[in-house]
Regions:
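Compositionally biased terminal segments of proteins
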Residues: 1-40, 44-197
Length: 197
């Protein structure tokens, strides 16, 4: 499965999480690999999957062992933007979006099992959510851009229609307002069915 792990945005994301690991190692010893796990969602994940538009905000689910304070990790990420040169050689900033929360998104709880490791066997491990889980996470809001993103992921072979239905139904069971999500799922299933006709 093709991902774009050497693009300027991807390199900037990995730099931010390397800086987080350096910060953690200054204050803690003998931590296991995966003491912090970051799961990349949103526009950055869409970019890594498709090399299409990116985002200046990192949407990520952060998990941390009890020994570490998740709040301190989030504050560090929020206060440490990464400057980088984009594809047009323009200087831009990448910022961590503290407001992203998987409990507010439509997410299949099995997403970590399908995540693609970008950085493994380190204190801070970074994962890219699968194209399937990225598509599912866009179902709750379902803006015009979300619809286009889901279609592009599907047309790029990132998931099958059957996998989409199954995972969307899993997400629906855990979502706060399942009726609205159900309606969005049905709408997208009809759109995706027509695409592959």
């Amino acid at each position: 499965m093709t991902i774009y792990s050497n693009s300027p945005i991807t390199i900037a994301i990995l730099k931010l999480f390397q800086e987080l690991e350096n910060y953690i190692l200054k204050n803690h010893k003998n931590l296991p690999h995966g003491a912090v796990k970051a799961f990349i969602f949103g526009g950055c994940a869409f970019h890594i999957h498709t090399n299409a538009r990116g985002s200046n905000d990192i949407d990520a689910e952060i998990q941390a062992i009890q020994q570490l304070k998740k709040h301190d990790i989030v504050v560090f990420l929020e206060n440490n933007d990464v400057e980088y040169l984009d594809d047009n050689n323009l200087e831009t900033n990448l910022e961590f979006d503290r407001s992203f929360n998987t409990s507010l998104a439509s997410v299949d709880p099995d997403y970590p099992e399908r995540a693609i490791p970008l950085v493994a066997n380190r204190i801070v491990e970074v994962y890219l959510v699968s194209g399937l889980d990225l598509a599912i996470s866009k179902l709750a809001r379902l803006s015009d851009r979300d619809i286009e993103d889901i279609k592009e992921l599907y047309l790029n072979g990132k998931f099958s229609l059957e996998a989409f239905k199954k995972s969307a139904n899993n997400a629906e069971m855990y979502y706060a307002t399942p009726e609205q999500l159900h309606s969005n799922i049905q709408y997208l299933v009809s759109i995706l069915s027509e695409l592959r006709g």
